[in-house]
Amino acid sequence: MQVQLTNRQQHILWATVRHYIATAEPVGSKALVEEYDLGVSSATIRNVMGVLEKSGLLYQPHTSAGRVPSDSGYRIYVDQLITPSLRDTTRAEVLAKEVESALQQHLQWEDWSLEILLQGAAQILASLSGCISLITMPQTNTASVRHLQLMQIETGRIMLILVTDSYETHSKLMDLPPARSETKPDPEVIDRELQIVSNFLNSHLRGRSLLEISTLDWSQLDREFQSYGEFLKNSVAELAHRSAAPAATQIMVRGLAEVLRQPEFSQLQQVKTIIQLLEEEQEQLWRLIFEEPELEDTHKSKVTVRIGAENPLEPIRTCSLISSTYRRGGVPLGSVGVLGPTRLDYESAIAVVAAAADYLSEAFS
């Protein structure tokens, strides 16, 4: 989500989110004047907060109350106000060292079973983040690619079909890439191009694990077909990972008691639906946290942040889910994540998840 804010609006949104995260109370201009050096009057802050409310970034839970961040407000906070600072400051490094130290101190890889080790890692992650922690068991035996085919269904629409070694079939409908659809090429030309790209996919991916698809080097595709490569890169990986969930998914879950102390979880029914998701619908949750983001360097962890209604699973649409994959040789093995209220310390949670994923990647290498 891209919203252009002035420097003043950015500072006031940042302060509002920080204050609400710390207090769980609606934020008024007086509190911001007292707690933050914003260099403007209370009246100016009120005016700016009004503008942010009209933009959908803040809202008032009650007419007489202060304002709280919306999901969109948190999204701007994460994408524009804190993510750059995480790259430029030492806070992420400090948290990463804390995670690594705790994992090294408490986990003995030579002596314990893998399940016990990951349970211990999940407990450490929950303690450091104050959230529900989620760690999936590594997927070492997954289906492999038998065949990939692109075909034109109708003008401007194509279908990607994936057949696994066990003859399971998965498909995805897509529009043609803009670079091709705008020129309105002859359908026979499109059919030939799709076959060439299909041949490329099969020559490079047949027999490989579904989890290895994200490592495909699309630059080897002929230059004249690069528009397909740029367009299909995420779609092929997404379809493969959607198809890769094993018959039995196992997720280590820790920290439920800690996060349920938060005021957002005071309603018994909401707590019950979250517990039901964690206990009875692990395959859906596995697919969600194991979804692969696009990576420039497949040996590094990239963190995915889903805020509130961005989560497709209904029980957690009032929560934030932060996740990343751990890898071996660039191939994803499993996932690490934390789940908490939308009012959570995103800086710490993002850094902790990234550090845990990097540590597990090194441990499995």
UniProtKB/Swiss-Prot annotation:
What Gene Ontology terms for biological process does this UniProt record contain? negative regulation of DNA-templated transcription
Report the protein name in the record.
Heat-inducible transcription repressor HrcA
Function of the protein: Negative regulator of class I heat shock genes (grpE-dnaK-dnaJ and groELS operons). Prevents heat-shock induction of these operons.
Listed A to Z, the keywords are: Repressor, Stress response, Transcription, Transcription regulation
The coiled-coil segments of this chain are none
This chain's source organism reads Nostoc sp. (strain PCC 7120 / SAG 25.82 / UTEX 2576)
- State the InterPro entries in the record: GAF-like_dom_sf (IPR029016), HrcA (IPR002571), HrcA_C (IPR021153), WH-like_DNA-bd_sf (IPR036388), WH_DNA-bd_sf (IPR036390), WHTH_transcript_rep_HrcA_IDD (IPR023120)
Give the record's family classification. Belongs to the HrcA family.
NCBIfam families named among the record's database cross-references: hrcA
- Name any one GO molecular function: DNA binding
Pfam families, A to Z? HrcA
Which domain of life does the UniProt lineage start with? Bacteria
